[in-house]
Design a protein with these regions (language model features):
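Hydrophobic-ligand-binding modules of eukaryotic lipid transfer/binding families
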Residues: 1-6, 89, 99-102
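Hydrophobic ligand-binding cavity/cleft-lining segments
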Residues: 1-44
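Short, highly charged low-complexity linear segments
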Residues: 8-12, 47, 78-84, 109, ...
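Short, low-complexity, polar/charged sequence segments that are solvent-exposed and flexible
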Residues: 24-29, 64-68, 84-87, 108-113
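A short, polar/proline- and glycine-enriched secondary-structure boundary/capping micro-motif
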Residues: 29, 57, 76-79, 100-105
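Hydrophobic-ligand binding "helix-grip"
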Residues: 44-85, 93-95
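N-terminal secretory/membrane-targeting helices
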Residues: 86-91, 121
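A conserved amphipathic terminal alpha-helix motif
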Residues: 95-123
Length: 123
């Protein structure tokens, strides 16, 4: 499964985006994430809509990738900005097609929550 959304972001560059996208900030940026149980910069544990999960944070050339390494669907979320464009991309993938409608809806809500969070950082 793959979802891609874009958010207008004329006031946010890659450096500020990377600084905002920390594990500790996840509950503030995405309402589907309830709290951070542990944060060790590049890895941590969160409690979210899908329960407790280990999360990894990887710095990319133009953004950040969060992955859920123990998730049975290998969910990843990349949030990137091309400084030549005034848009932030929110890209979510799983390692297989998802047929469970409730899970699909929860992923769609996860992305909607990220859009809201990114918009608050941009303004």
């Amino acid at each position: 499964m793959e979802l891609l959304e874009e958010v207008e972001s004329p006031n946010l560059d890659q450096i500020k985006l990377k600084n905002e996208l920390t594990i500790n900030n996840l509950p503030r940026l995405c309402h589907s994430i309830d709290n951070v149980i542990s944060d060790q910069n590049s890895r941590g544990v969160i409690y979210c809509v899908w329960g407790q999960h280990e999360i990894h944070r990887e710095i990319l050339n133009n953004g950040i990738r969060f992955s859920f390494p123990q998730c049975p669907n290998a969910l990843t979320l990349s949030i990137t900005k091309n400084n030549d464009a005034n848009k932030i991309s929110i890209h979510c993938t799983t390692n297989k097609n998802i047929e469970d409608e409730d899970f699909i809806e929860s992923i769609n809500q996860f992305i909607k929550d990220w859009i809201v969070g990114i918009k608050t950082v941009c303004h």
